[in-house]
């Protein structure tokens, strides 16, 4: 599998100077301030929902390049520190900007999906990711379609990996999701459909059956 071209990392959304910084970080990480690079990537991920879905791949590539070049992990440390800072103020972020909060959850799940230690997901990210998903499964979040959409998308992406790391918390999360599905009011029909789909997706071993795919995707397109 060849390395993706730099353009595939969707860095065109940055100004020319930042694009150059990111390109250098990918090719010659020792030549740039990698903590600054980590902050640039996190800042942009909180504002750009498309980039937040892509950034994990770029972060993984920079970590690999730095490890190969210098055997160090300055970038990874900077990235995890910044993720932790945002995690600690996540309620304030959600209150300030729902889009920023949804982007943060997308980003941390993306990082969890891509970053590996000895071929395993990073234990340090398991509980923060779960905490974010638990927050999305609270009644006040389930009344907002953007948050339901985010919850379901992230469970499609990392649910199976998360369950392997901590099955008990996944059971608890799905109790909340099932309770939310039965909320008497405040849930849109699309939100109900999405929650039912993810409940069935997990019950089928994190797979979509052909019948379910046909049913849900015809409903959503209608």
From Swiss-Prot:
Gene3D superfamilies: 1.25.40.180. GO terms for cellular component: cytosol; nucleus. One of its GO terms (biological process) is regulation of translational initiation. Keywords: Cytoplasm, Nucleus, Translation regulation. It comes from Bos taurus (Bovine). It is found in: Cytoplasm; Nucleus. Signal peptide: none annotated. It comes from the Eukaryota. This is MIF4G domain-containing protein. The gene is MIF4GD. Residues 3-205 form the MIF4G domain. Its main location: cytoplasm. InterPro entries: ARM-type_fold (IPR016024), MIF4G-like_typ-3 (IPR003890), mRNA_TranslReg/HistoneTransl (IPR051367). Functions in replication-dependent translation of histone mRNAs which differ from other eukaryotic mRNAs in that they do not end with a poly-A tail but a stem-loop. May participate in circularizing those mRNAs specifically enhancing their translation. GO terms for molecular function: RNA binding; translation activator activity. Interacts with EIF4G1, EIF4G2 and SLBP; probably tethered by SLBP to the 3'-end of mRNAs ending with the histone stem-loop, it also interacts with EIF4G1 which is bound to their 5'-end. Belongs to the MIF4GD family.
């Amino acid at each position: 599998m060849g390395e993706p071209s730099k353009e595939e990392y969707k860095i065109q959304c940055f100004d020319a100077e930042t694009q150059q910084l990111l390109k250098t970080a990918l090719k010659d990480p020792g030549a740039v301030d990698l903590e600054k690079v980590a902050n640039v990537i996190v800042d942009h991920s909180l504002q750009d929902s498309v980039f937040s879905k892509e950034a994990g791949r770029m972060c993984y590539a920079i970590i690999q390049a730095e490890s190969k070049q210098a055997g160090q992990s300055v970038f990874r440390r900077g990235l995890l520190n910044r993720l932790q800072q945002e995690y600690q103020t996540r309620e304030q972020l959600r209150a300030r900007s729902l889009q920023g909060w949804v982007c943060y959850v997308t980003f941390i799940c993306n990082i969890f999906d891509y970053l590996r230690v000895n071929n395993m997901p990073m234990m340090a990210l398991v509980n923060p990711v779960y905490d974010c998903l638990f927050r999305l499964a609270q009644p006040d979040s389930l009344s907002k379609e953007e948050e339901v959409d985010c919850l379901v998308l992230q469970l499609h992406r990392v649910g199976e990996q998360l369950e392997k790391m901590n099955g008990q918390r996944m059971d608890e999360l799905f109790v909340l999701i099932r309770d939310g599905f039965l909320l008497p009011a405040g849930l849109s029909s699309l939100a109900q459909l999405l929650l039912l789909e993810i409940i069935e997706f997990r019950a089928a071993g994190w797979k979509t059956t052909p019948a379910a795919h046909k049913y849900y995707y015809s409903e959503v397109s209608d």
